Amino acid sequence: MKTSTTPSGSSEGTSLASEILRRFRLLQMDHTWTESLYATLQFPHRSQRSSLSLVDSTGLISEQISLNPSDFCPYSATGSATGGVVYANYGRPEDFNWLKSAGVSVVGCVVVMRVGGGVSFAEKVWLAEKSGASGALIYPDPADLPQDPRRLGLNAHTAVSEHVHLGSGDPFTPGFPSFNHTQFPSIQSSGLPLIPALPISATVAAKLLSQLSGPSCPSSWRSRLPYVRCVVGPEFSSGRRVKMSVHNVMTPVLLNNIFSSLEGRDEPDQYIILGAQRDSLGPGAVKSGVGTAILLELARTFSAMVKNGFSPRRSLLFVSWDGGDFGNVGATEWLEGYLSMLHLKAVAYFSLDQAVMGDDVLSAYSSPLLVDLLDAAIRQVEHPRHAGQTIFSQAEREGGSWRIMKPLYLNSGAYSFTAFAGVPAMELRFTEERAYPFVNTPLDTTSRLQEVLGGRLGVTGRSLGELVGEMVLRLAHDHILPLRIDSYAQAVLQFSAQLNKHSAELQSRGLSPQWVFSARGDYSRAAETLQRAIDNSDLHDPTTARFYNTRIMRVEYYFLSQYVSVVETPFRHVIHGRGDHTLSALAEHLALLTSDPERFDEKRFRRQLAFFTWTLQGAANALTGDVWSIHNTYTFTH
């Protein structure tokens, strides 16, 4: 594992890339190569530092607050913001809603938010901006990240850095690749923030929040900062205000993605992809080191198996990605470059990013198409902490193995593969109840990770590698791809139940939910019919197997909405994506019928319902296969 900082574009990063390439070549796989591209990344200005200060009523600086110049939020807006301070807990939608209901305005204020709460830095800053804030400060609270240095905690003077682009890839080429010689149109991602953002330490946060006056916050918002009463602001008791200035610069950087592959015997044009982020702004033991080590070990293992006689039906592709700390830039740009063909070629993607943060609880952030594959694997692999017990048996003791499966999230290395490209993807991670506090800090070192794990880093990494290896082996070997093609019917069924509750109200507005029910039924029947056909076929006949696998591989892709622009709305997946076309947006809009009927927009809802249903019906039609087998009646209004 690497031991030093390896940011993209640095000499250290280039040296590490050369070492990974050398390791791949030593394995003598069928193909090893590098793909390079220029992308626009953001770094702190070399001579002009970002700053934070307290100013008096005339705007003069009364106190300069010390910051670490290497702490920054990539893709923050540059410039200054001055105003009162509002404490917004984790910066979740419900937190900003509470402030609004309490009569606390964040307009023109600098919002202070805690790391965590299931919300990325990018989402926090976006929500603060949407609420009218002029700036954002994000800090690690001792309630969320342990800060007792005697128990492997985060130093109270250490900030956590993370990018704030609400998206992935190069934000100046949204939806299309940054490959060399591309003629860039003058466009940028709508996910770039318009307000400055800075990471601050718990010590700095305590200095600001301890001086606030204003309404008390809810008990659930209480932090563990010393000498801080839980009030939300926006006024300082001294009458002062805060001024923040961000001086980052956009820089074109050469990124290098490194590939190595083993060709399949029967279907070499279908491949299973394994990838890990290589770069990191800090030492990155968890962020990139562990994943890269597991990637190399899996490549070595499968290469040795092939040399010893194993012949995979499908190809295996091992990838070391660059630009991960800036929003999975290298991986996303590669996806954008091959978008038109990936759903025809890529069977599944496994992300090894942040694979080991503990050794107790396994989480699988995944497309539901891979659930059966995971279920079989956890029954085979021993738990890293509980010798003699499989991961499955231990999970059953602790409340059920179903808890392992979790939805994909925006900052995941797997997210873009599914939400943008329509490829089933999974990111696996071992954690423990006490959060690993050092991710995205200069303290994320191998020695600290080993100490947190009690010296079991090797054992835990091996367990995770075996899990991925078991799943990849089945995908590479089985005649029929073991993907659960009916998995999305359950998600739509839950929404159908919500629609049914509002059926009378919808029909009074001239909207019929029957079309969604019909499309869901068609999809379920198509999946069942395809499964029966597979069960009754001779799967050893290569033509038959190929015919069915081609349809199975495209199921995820069918859930990408064809009715939104990939440039304006890159995450087109109607279940996992982001935007007005998604099932979650439709459900939130539907909920307004009960919570706030005046905000329900009938015209917008009609459009959302039609687009979602057309996507679902299209997936059903594609699974059915032949046009003479499809019988549709399209009616969604009276």
Q: Model regions: which residues?
A:
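His/Asp/Glu-rich mid-to-C-terminal helical/loop segments that flank catalytic regions of hydrolases
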Residues: L317, R434-L493, T594-F636
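Second-shell loop/turn segments in exported
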Residues: K2-E12, D71-S76, Y87, V112-V125, ...
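C-terminal amphipathic alpha-helical interaction region
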Residues: A545-H638
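Alpha-helical metal-binding/catalytic segments enriched in His/Glu/Asp
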Residues: L274-V329, E333, V468-M471
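Metal-dependent peptidase/peptidase-like ectodomains
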Residues: G59, H163-S216, E267, W321-Q450, ...
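Structural recognition of the beta-strand scaffold that forms the well-ordered cores
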Residues: W33-T34, V85-Y87, V110-R114, G135-Y139, ...
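Noncatalytic luminal/extracellular "stalk/propeptide" segments of secretory-pathway proteins
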Residues: K2-V110, G117, P140-A143, D148-P177, ...
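Soluble metallo-hydrolase cores and metallopeptidase-like ectodomains found primarily
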Residues: L67-W98, P174-V286, R300, A304-N308
